[in-house]
């Protein structure tokens, strides 16, 4: 694994990165290297924090599933039972399960919105109350790239009094000594890696074939893909701004280390009852993804292994990938938790160093 990890630097694919493997609760691989800034002046250190992008979704799903296990949220009751203002405009019967498995049809906003919206929890939740589904909930599935975290997070807040940031801190990070966060503050801001965007060239030979349809579809904000990823447009370099790092966007801006996210996945069997974990890792939706324009397979908040969309290395693995190449998963048969994070982003949904390792 060390050879595969260092190859990313030798080939110029990575600027800075970290990878960790936990087996039976024992940390057996813990590698980091390179630099945490584009100019390569600051070394990537043991405690460097990296933006996890959509690998954050697995953390948010765990928070919500713990609330389900405690009877505070119900998978198959209308979300409007805990969020009364939500149950309008075709959303009356939308369930928590449909949000977790990306069948709710609430992938984005029909009308143009400003990036300011995503920094205001109350405002974005009010906007979601006014939205209508892009398809009949439960009939199709499509990746809820940004809305996933707000929809689940508001349900969690109304049912328990905690948003994902609070639940993560109080129930997971602090008790288990995990360096994982939604919303950074103080000295933690100074530990962040600078994310370097991938070069996106639609139709270019440099663009992975699996990503070309996705990149083309992103160009039109009136399509499900464009609405999910480009409405609002966040602007260049947003992921490195202090404002973004301080915000709570539970689908896209978790920060942490590879070591601690691998550890979290390795402890999944302790963190969820068997019956909840079993259901969460059973296929809930699969097939043509209306947003990602490719095959995807989801459990309850987790991506599930499929040879067409590999999360892990074999059937049974579950976890989540993040934009640019990060990935975290648990392999229950081998009892292995894995995580790879990096700051040089690549194109594609599951790509880059994680796939190579």
Regions found by a protein language model. Name each.
Residues 45, 131-138, 148-151, 241-250:
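Flexible glycine/proline-enriched surface loops and loop-helix/loop-strand junctions
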Residues 249, 270, 276, 281-288, ...:
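Short, gly/Ser/Thr-rich active-site loops of penicillin-recognizing serine hydrolases
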Residues 46, 51-55, 69-111, 129-130, ...:
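Active-site helix/loop module of the DD-peptidase/beta-lactamase fold
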Residues 195-252, 256, 282-334:
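Active-site Gly/Thr loop motif
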Residues 39, 125-134, 234-245:
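The feature captures the short pre-catalytic strand/loop hairpin that immediately precedes
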Residues 1-53:
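Short, conserved catalytic-motif segment at the N-terminal edge
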Residues 5-6, 25, 51-77, 152-157, ...:
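Active-site SXXK
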Residues 102, 148-155, 248, 252-272, ...:
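Active-site-proximal alpha-helical segments within enzyme catalytic domains
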């Amino acid at each position: 694994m060390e050879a595969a990890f260092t190859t990313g630097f030798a080939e110029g694919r990575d600027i800075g990165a970290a990878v960790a493997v936990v087996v039976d609760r024992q940390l057996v691989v813990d590698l980091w290297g390179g630099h945490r800034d584009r100019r390569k002046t600051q070394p990537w250190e043991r405690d460097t924090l990296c933006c996890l992008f959509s690998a954050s979704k697995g953390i948010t799903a765990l928070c919500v599933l713990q609330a389900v296990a405690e009877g505070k949220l119900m998978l198959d009751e209308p979300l409007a039972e805990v969020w009364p203002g939500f149950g309008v405009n075709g959303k009356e019967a939308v369930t928590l399960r449909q949000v977790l498995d990306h069948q709710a049809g609430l992938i984005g906003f029909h009308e143009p919105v400003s990036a300011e919206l995503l920094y205001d929890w109350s405002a974005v939740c009010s906007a979601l109350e006014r939205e209508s589904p892009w398809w009949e909930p439960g009939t199709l599935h499509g990746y809820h790239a940004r809305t996933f975290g707000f929809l689940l997070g508001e349900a969690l807040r109304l049912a328990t009094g905690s948003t994902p940031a609070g639940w993560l801190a109080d129930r997971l990070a602090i008790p288990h000594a995990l360096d994982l966060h939604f919303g950074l503050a103080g000295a933690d801001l100074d530990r962040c890696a600078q994310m370097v965007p991938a070069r996106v060239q639609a139709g270019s030979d440099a663009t992975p074939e699996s990503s070309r349809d996705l990149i083309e579809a992103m160009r039109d904000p009136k399509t499900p893909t464009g609405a999910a990823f480009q409405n609002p447009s966040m602007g260049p370099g947003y992921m490195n701004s202090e404002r973004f790092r301080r915000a709570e966007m539970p689908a896209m801006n978790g920060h942490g280390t590879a070591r601690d996210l691998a550890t979290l996945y390795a402890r999944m069997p302790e963190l969820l009852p068997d019956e909840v974990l079993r259901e969460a890792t059973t296929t809930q939706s699969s097939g043509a993804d209306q947003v990602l324009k490719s095959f995807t397979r989801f459990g309850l908040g987790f991506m599930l292994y499929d040879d067409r969309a590999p999360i892990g290395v074999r059937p049974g693995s579950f976890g989540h990938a993040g934009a640019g190449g990060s990935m975290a998963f648990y392999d229950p048969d081998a009892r292995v938790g894995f995580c790879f994070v990096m700051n040089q982003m690549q194109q594609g949904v599951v790509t880059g160093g994680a796939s190579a390792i």
